[in-house]
Regions:
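Conserved catalytic cores of very large enzyme subunits
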Residues: 11-13, 18-229
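Acidic, metal/cofactor-coordinating or nucleic-acid-engaging core segments within structured domains
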Residues: 5
Length: 229
């Protein structure tokens, strides 16, 4: 009631309305979906003293909300970009007190929250979409230590998107990481994971991979390379 700026007042009222709705009720817009994802992430962190709690294949499950709002003229790409940069800044605020040695070696006190984009659909088509580009751009703009950004790479990945990934890597802040679908998916299948689930894997923590809500194994040794071999 005390806010005098009309635009800011409208924003605050919209925030209040959204926060009173999600995640108890389903999200119906991109703004609501982003807020719902944040609330769930925060609740999980608090409830479980969380570690390596990751966002999964963000560009896949958020894409329908994004495109619906874009097509209906409710948001622009720039609006979505701003919302995502705000989400990543909030993600960075989740923290734990670490030892001095860990803090020095880990560029602060990261919680190893990971966001996965790219990859393939369950019918083996390239999964890169418009939101994949927006997520990549938002991470490039913020250049934060959290969340980690992982791009699932495969032979038929959108060339323009992969070129953009390389440009972001050249900025020098260590992201995005690349996960090779053509190695990881067969590995999951060899472990007995169903093919449709293997194609839906995402990165968690530093370098681990899992199928969201279905299968996970902290095979941290996957980051080691056998150079002689």
């Amino acid at each position: 009631d005390k806010e005098t700026d009309a635009k800011r007042k409208e924003e605050l009222l919209q925030m209040s309305k959204i926060c009173a709705k999600v995640p108890y009720e389903p999200a119906n817009s991109f703004r609501e979906a982003v807020q719902s994802v944040w609330f769930i992430q925060l609740i999980l962190q608090i409830e479980s003293n969380g570690h390596s709690l990751s966002y999964g294949r963000f560009d896949q499950y958020m894409y329908p909300y994004y495109m619906k709002d874009i097509n209906e003229g409710k948001i622009t790409k720039e609006d979505a970009l701003e919302l995502l940069t705000c989400l990543w800044i909030k993600t960075l605020t989740i923290n734990k007190v670490r030892s001095q040695s860990h803090t020095l070696s880990s560029a602060g006190s990261p919680m190893y929250q990971n966001v996965t984009i790219g990859g393939q659909t369950t019918d083996k088509k390239d999964a890169v979409n418009e939101l994949s580009f927006v997520v990549l751009q938002s991470v490039a703009q913020t250049r934060l230590t959290q969340p980690n950004l992982t791009v699932r790479y495969h032979a038929n990945i959108d060339k323009h998107f992969f070129d953009e990934c390389i440009e972001v890597m050249k900025l020098g802040f260590g992201m995005p990481a690349l996960n090779n679908d053509e190695i990881i998916i067969p590995s999951f299948i060899n472990w007995g994971v169903k093919e449709e689930d293997a194609y839906n894997y995402s990165a968690i923590g530093c370098v681990e991979t899992a199928v969201p809500g279905k299968w996970g194994y902290r095979c941290t040794g996957m980051s080691y390379m056998n150079f002689p071999r």
